[in-house]
């Protein structure tokens, strides 16, 4: 890669229409898991002006008021006024759930008498990633893009910037020198707002622009990275119509926002609305857990993990490690250590990360990774010391490539 380059990642707020859909899907998953941890769930959501459609496949012994869960989620996000295009009190909610296919269930439920050898719910490939660009071991562009829209929501909800509305998008372009973050080149922040914040049809009031820069952006970004940074605030001007009224929202359409902002490949499977027997979700969480522990152990400055599964088969097809030359031991040796220290069978993952709990709605906005809340068990670095010891490394041996 070039010595001096730019890299960009984006995020969206909890009020973005696709994120509204993700949060409803995960709120329904949580409601089911609270009553029946064995629920099999693939909950999809569509949001549009004044309308929510709930569809997918659910097999459960739980009794959940799906319509009320959807309304409560929309209210929490902040869509409580018909002027916003959707109002939790009056929107229509249509429910069209089926049961899980028996053909899938037989491969997952009866792959083995040993519950740890329960098969994967589908084929697929998943990636995990970690790097040392932030204390959370996340790529800096996506990490700070998340923090920007998270702060937008915080200041909207606590009344400090009462003219904001729920929908927002952020984008951070970071300059790298010698492979390390050097400075922030450009920040884009587009936020929905009340009509009185527009100066003209295509421009915003300067007071609005100043408030967004000083109250949202500057408190979040590292001061030492702000060298001649460009700030683009609502660059097309007026952003009054937003959320599900501005665009139809669907579950699973923000998979790069949900993961690493494009810093590593993506297997294509979305997360929200899926119970942890779906390896699209659980194995991606496990791959992040593995990669983060590898970096936390000092075995590499960055680590990409690929795992793949076949439906009905418990053991992964492969566990592949790529450290892009930053490893202190060979990638193949890191892969061998991973196999020794992590059980990446679907049931092993569920047990290792304690995933049969109602923890998922919180993951559905501001990223599934790089979060320190206790629900995010895949962010623990509890295997780092064991990995380091097994690699035979002492504290002074970081970043020495094995010959």
From Swiss-Prot:
Segments for region (Flexible loop): 100-110
Compartments (UniProt record): Cytoplasm
List of residues binding Mg(2+): 18
CDD domains in the cross-refs: S-AdoMet_synt (cd18079)
Binding site for ATP: 16, 167-169, 238-239, 247, 253-254, 270, 274
Classification via SUPFAM superfamilies: S-adenosylmethionine synthetase (SSF55973)
InterPro entries: ADOMET_SYNTHASE_CS (IPR022631), S-AdoMet_synt_C (IPR022630), S-AdoMet_synt_central (IPR022629), S-AdoMet_synt_N (IPR022628), S-AdoMet_synthetase (IPR002133), S-AdoMet_synthetase_sfam (IPR022636)
Species: Verminephrobacter eiseniae (strain EF01-2)
Any GO CC annotation of this UniProt entry: cytoplasm
UniProt keyword Magnesium, yes or no: yes
Listed cofactors: Mg(2+); K(+)
Predominant place of localization: cytoplasm
Superkingdom of the organism of origin: Bacteria
Function of the molecule: Catalyzes the formation of S-adenosylmethionine (AdoMet) from methionine and ATP. The overall synthetic reaction is composed of two sequential steps, AdoMet formation and the subsequent tripolyphosphate hydrolysis which occurs prior to release of AdoMet from the enzyme.
Catalyzed chemical reaction(s): L-methionine + ATP + H2O = S-adenosyl-L-methionine + phosphate + diphosphate
Protein name, as recorded: S-adenosylmethionine synthase
Group of enzyme by EC: transferase
Listed GO biological process terms: one-carbon metabolic process; S-adenosylmethionine biosynthetic process
Keywords assigned: ATP-binding, Cytoplasm, Magnesium, Metal-binding, Nucleotide-binding, One-carbon metabolism, Potassium, Transferase
GO molecular-function terms, A-Z: ATP binding; magnesium ion binding; methionine adenosyltransferase activity
EC code(s) of this entry: 2.5.1.6
Family: Belongs to the AdoMet synthase family.
């Amino acid at each position: 890669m070039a010595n001096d380059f730019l890299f960009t990642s984006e995020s969206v707020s909890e009020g973005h229409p696709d994120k509204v859909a993700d949060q409803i899907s995960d709120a329904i998953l949580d409601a089911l898991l609270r009553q029946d941890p064995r629920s099999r769930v693939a909950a999809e959501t569509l949001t549009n002006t004044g309308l929510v459609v709930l569809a997918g496949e659910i097999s459960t012994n739980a009794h959940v008021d799906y319509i009320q869960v959807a309304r409560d989620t929309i209210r929490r996000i902040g869509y409580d006024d018909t002027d916003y295009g959707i109002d939790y009190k009056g929107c229509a909610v249509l429910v069209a759930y089926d049961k899980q296919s028996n053909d899938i269930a037989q491969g997952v439920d009866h792959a083995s008498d040993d519950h740890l050898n329960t098969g994967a719910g589908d084929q697929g490939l998943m990636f995990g990633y970690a790097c040392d660009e932030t204390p959370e071991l996340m790529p800096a562009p996506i990490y700070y893009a998340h923090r920007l829209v998270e702060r937008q929501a915080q200041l909207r909800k606590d009344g400090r910037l009462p003219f904001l509305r729920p929908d927002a998008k952020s984008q951070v372009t970071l300059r790298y020198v010698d492979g390390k973050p050097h400075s922030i080149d450009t920040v884009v922040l587009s936020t929905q707002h009340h009509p009185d914040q527009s100066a003209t049809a295509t421009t915003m009031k300067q007071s609005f622009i100043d408030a967004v820069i000083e109250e949202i952006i500057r408190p979040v970004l590292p001061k030492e990275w702000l060298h001649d940074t460009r700030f683009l605030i609502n660059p097309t001007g007026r952003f009054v119509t937003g959320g599900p009224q501005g665009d139809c929202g669907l579950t699973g359409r923000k998979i790069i926002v949900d993961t690493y902002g494009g810093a590593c490949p993506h297997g294509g499977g979305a997360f929200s609305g899926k119970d942890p027997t779906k390896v699209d979700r659980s194995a991606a969480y496990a791959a992040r857990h593995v990669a983060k522990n590898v970096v936390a152990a000092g075995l590499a400055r960055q680590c990409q993990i690929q795992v793949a599964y076949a439906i009905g088969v418990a053991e992964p097809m492969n566990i592949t490690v790529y450290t892009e030359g930053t490893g202190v031991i060979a990638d193949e040796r890191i892969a061998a250590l991973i196999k020794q220290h992590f059980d990446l069978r679907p049931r092993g993952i569920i047990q290792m990360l304690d995933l049969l709990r109602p923890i998922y709605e919180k993951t559905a906005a501001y990223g599934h990774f790089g979060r320190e809340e206790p629900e995010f068990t895949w962010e623990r670095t509890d295997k780092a010391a064991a990995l380091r010891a097994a690699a035979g490394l002492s504290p002074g041996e970081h970043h020495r490539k094995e010959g």
